């Protein structure tokens, strides 16, 4: 149940006693701020003098408001009354303390790509992190400090220009921490593991407004939880993570478009390609989709697949020979510096996958292998929608992600909160529906559930696993955070210790109020 702002306070202060001459704390005053009367003017008057002069405070009447509150999906949007953009890391605990004293809910935002239904229960102040965007490479050249507002694009470009790379999400527009606190899959995981596997330490603002340094020797229990379930425990203002020499000057990409008649051949070749944990570590990422392309056919979806290889075309094409043997209706390939690979694979800031402001209906499941029979059922279901509702079909994208997973599986499962290291493939059903079109929203939900069940039925005997960063919020706790009872108990224990009032409950929460 959604609690009212008057009954939910994240302030965990000392007992109040009546002392002669003492002022009454704001949260006991008769006219405390509530959701109904929260304005940027009042927040500026009360908070402005306590934070740095580069901190921005504004509300819905400001021309910047719509831009900074826009999200990847308009499904289950949080209700934002006031924006506060801290100018310094030290402003964040001050903002949190202010919110606590006034019973105001707060939500930290970097990329705005969360799609969890739980976000729709939020009503309060957005702490926009975009001004916290500095990167500092350490003298050793083995790590760097990153501030909490960074998205993937500037991290890739800055490090590359300095001769380095690190693990990031696959899409340029996603927040580094939004991805990393849930694990963080990306093109370097075959070599180096997940984003979270490379985090060395974090500066975290807890729910009570205190700041802690979290690493292997300080709050090591919380470090475990931050690596896979970190959205539940605090606001990360900065973090140190591993960086690596950038390697080859160019990467090779090869994109294919196949017709549906090639489906079984494609997926059988993919299973051989990935083998049993034998995907070459430099064959960093391959991703495919069922989607409409009416320049090829208006009667059924096409199969699009993209491969990215860390190295030369000559090396890559040896591995891609089985796919070159499958008759395609379109192919393109090239060799580009790594920062241009997202554009080549359709995951850049300017590509549709990064566009904000649509209504998305989604579902997801982790897989170990591709099941060609299940994929045929999914493809034929898509084809039926093309005939039944071309508008719904036009906005659909059934996505498949394959990685080199050696670096992920090399990390012990019990060493972090990230639960699904033996799963190798990520999937996402994603349908864009028109705003305020209830009938199509319901049809898209039904389709999303159908595809999820078909994917999962293709791996008999396995429980359903869902990547928390792709989870829509309707999965079970076990499906998002792991099926082992000890793992969930450890997360609950950390929650009780570090966030007893469950302030951080708006992104696929461990504890549901």
Task: Annotate each language-model stretch with its function.
Residues 2, 11, 15-513:
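Soluble FAD-dependent oxygen oxidases
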